[in-house]
Structure formats: C-alpha cells, structure tokens
Amino acid sequence: MTTELRTRLGAPVVRAPLPVAPSLTPLFAEGGLVRGRTVACTGDAALSAALALSAVATRAGSWLAVVGVPNLGIAAAIEAGVAVERIVLAQPPRASREWITTVAALVEGFDVLIVAPPASLSHHDTRRLQTRILARQSVLIVVDMSALPSLGSPDVFVSDIDVHADTVAWSGIERGGSHITQRTVNVRVEGRRCAAPREETVTLPCSMRQPAS
C-alpha cells in the first residue's frame, strides 16, 4: 500500500526509524528506533543508554522530552550528544493522573520521550499512553529508576524492546584528574519485537567527579 493510499484510507503511515549512533546501530535489526514502539531501559547505565539512543535523532531534527527524571541537567544531556535546542525537561507531579496527563500532552509534539514513571502508575494508564504513542508514531523510552523513592519500574508498560545496560569500566581518572569522562557499557537488546538478542560493548560519554578520598 502506497503512502498516499494509506493516508486516504486513514491507515497509519509507516515512517523511517529514528537514527541511533553508529556504535548502537548493530543492536537494532531495523537500524534504529522504530516509531510507535516502547523501549524499556534497565541496568546501572539505563539513563545513559536512553540518552545515547535519542541523541542522534535530536541532531537530525527530532524533539526530545525528558519527563520525571530527577537530577538530570541540560549539561548531562549535552555530554550525551543531545542537541540542546531540541530537548525539554519536565517534572510533573508524581501522582499518576497528573503525570500521565503531562506525558500524553507531550506526545503530540515530541518524537522521542524519555520517562521515569511514578510508582503509582497503573497498567490502565500505560495502555492508554502506549496507544497514543503508536498513533502519533513517537518513541517512548522508559527508564528504570525504581531504586529511588516514589519512582516505579518499566514493568508497568508492555515493552517492545528491552535494553539492559551495565557499566563495565570508567575512564578519565587515570590521566591524573578527578573528572570521569567516559564509561564503557555492555548493552544487551532483546524483547518481543526483537527476533534474537543482540549485545555490544560501547563507550558512552559521562560527566562525573571522583569522590574525594
């Protein structure tokens, strides 16, 4: 079915996947993030992986909304390669109704959303949100920050792709400074929309100070 015919019939138009960094491309059979899907990021490098997945898309013109992620500043997003002029940070109340209303509104204007869901979120709420994500052909990246108070797990969503990212090593401090500049991360991708698990070890930018001894 052609794009024009699909539009006339009211069928969703299939758009090209959102691009990811070359080091991450082998992890995705489609070569990038398929629009309309939900990606769950877990592991100690979950947020770094989420930012890395969305960075190239922002530099290509896509807009990114980061919702409910505590202590994330613009500087950290820039370190990850995100285009600063195409990112919006939002901190809605963590009550499920206010949170879901905020995210649902942002879906209308953003191609990628990185979210840390509140613990109070229900499956009913997430089903409605994912239906909107699919209709709008955005990409929802849910980050596991459940170790923090009042934040929940990605398990409340039905994920299409599961990305597990664990730190293997830090680098930067061996040059004599206290500033960590990079982290080596093992990234494993699997899930119901992934024909077979894929795994890569990649280097991600990082901005951290080594604690004083």
Which residues fall in each region the model found?
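Detector for small/aliphatic-rich hydrophobic stretches
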Residues: 1-66, 191, 210-213
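Aromatic/hydrophobic pocket-lining residues that form π-stacking "cages" and hydrophobic walls in ligand
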Residues: 53, 103, 129
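Short, solvent-exposed amphipathic alpha-helical segments in soluble enzyme
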Residues: 55-56, 81-82, 130-132
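Structural alpha-beta junctions
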Residues: 59-63, 84, 135-139
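Long, charge-dense
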Residues: 65-122, 126
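A contiguous pocket-lining binding segment that forms or flanks enzyme active sites
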Residues: 107, 111-161
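Phosphate-binding/switch region of NTP-binding enzymes
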Residues: 147-213
